[in-house]
Amino acid sequence: MATTNSSSQLTGNLALMPVSNHDRVFGWSQHAALWFSLGVGLLVMQIGAYLVPAVGTRDAAIAIVLGSLIGAGLLAWTAKLGCDSGLTSAGLMHATYGSAFAKLPVLLNIVQLIGWTTFELVVMRDGTAAIGKQSFGLDLSGFGGMVATTAIWGGVLCALIAASMLTTVRKLIGRFALPLVIASLLWLTWQFGGQIAAKGFDAFWTRPGNGSMGLFSAMDLVIAMPVSWLPLIADYARHGKNGKSAMSGTWLGYALANIWCYALGVMVVSVATPGTDLVTALLLAQGGLIALGLILFDEIDNAYGDAYSGAVSSHSLLPNWSIRQWGLLIVVACTVLALFLPMHSLEPFLLMLSSVFVPLYGVILGRWSLNATSVNTTQKSVDVTAAALWIAGIVLYHVMAKWAPQWGAALPTLAFTFVLAWLTRPQSARALQAV
């Protein structure tokens, strides 16, 4: 169990204190259900559809399976650290980088989470408009329609944020949303799988790419999705009953969902008419309206996950506001931003911003993952070594992406920061790991 400094206790900063045993209620099934649900999304399918023209079906499948297993494994490893230490993501950043310097990655995380929450609201709004036009002849693309649909989804998200996170995960996601989204994925797989079989599996499997991307670059793109969840997974995993179930449940749940949704994107682009967007292709499938509606409904938990974690991180900086109050403010702000920001144009920026969290968590895992009981938030204001390793990792990531894309950027950066962070870990951590 992690230790915390007295100032956090006195100010009631729940984001920097280890979670109480009373709130450790998630078992294996809750971890698996949550991260399967969060692994499902239209953006994942869109990236899967993007891979095929670049690398071909066979290499896309390899990149999807390996990238998902590695990315989900990294998520699961971080989940175990969060569960064993009882700390939030912000708490882990404070313990690793120092109380003053940690504010920088915490702020970057808040910016990322606000961006992703806004993006999810746009996805749900646009999906609702597509369903309305395709199925009912309603034109919701005007400003009035945009305001109405965005406000409806924002209102649903506010209601979820106002409720208990523990209840939302255990009852709404685990018992209600998960079975419905699995049913929709099974139906879409059956529909598009049947079309592929009718056209011939060999032609589908041997489709070549145009060479615009290599296998490792494709894996980086796949890994980018689970990596985008790294800065918030501890906010949920710390409520687990034990680290092993948090790790295995997260790994299996997220990897399965990620592979499935990427594969669906590959299947859709392989049978759809050229130029048809993903949402339209899904709607044109038999039963696609219901299936897409269920997937859109599932998008709300992605937005919830981002907004709740953004609230936890914000509370860590300004604890005078509760996590619930921060959550409501973030949702309202994101609902307004969804009306004005060109979120589809900002999507590459959000993925790029996610790249800074590969070295960030390489350092965190290198410092603490081998003995989470040594984690504490009584660090100095700046851990110069950890900060330097993170910055060096960011530089390495972008150098690799630009000048050696054939080797990928995520895995070399993760290995570099992890090894150096482990070698330079504090003496207290060395002593505990030696016991």
Which residue stretches match the model-derived regions?
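C-terminal membrane-solvent junction of multi-pass transporters and transport-like membrane proteins
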Residues: P18, Y361-L423, Q427-V435
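Transmembrane alpha-helical segments of multi-pass small-molecule transport proteins
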Residues: Q134-S164, P179-W187, G214-L230, A255-L256, ...
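Membrane-interface "cap" regions at the ends of multi-pass membrane proteins
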Residues: M1-R58, P208-A218, R238-S245, R425-V435
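Membrane-interface loop-to-helix entry segments
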Residues: T149-F192, M247-Y254, L350-G362, A410-F418
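Hydrophobic alpha-helical segments and their helix-loop junctions in multi-pass secondary transporters
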Residues: L121, R125-A129, I161, P179-W205, ...
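Membrane-water interface regions at transmembrane-helix termini and the short interhelical loops
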Residues: A54, K80, L104, A130, ...
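Juxtamembrane transmembrane-helix boundary signature
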Residues: I64-T96, L107-Q112, T118-L121, R425-A431
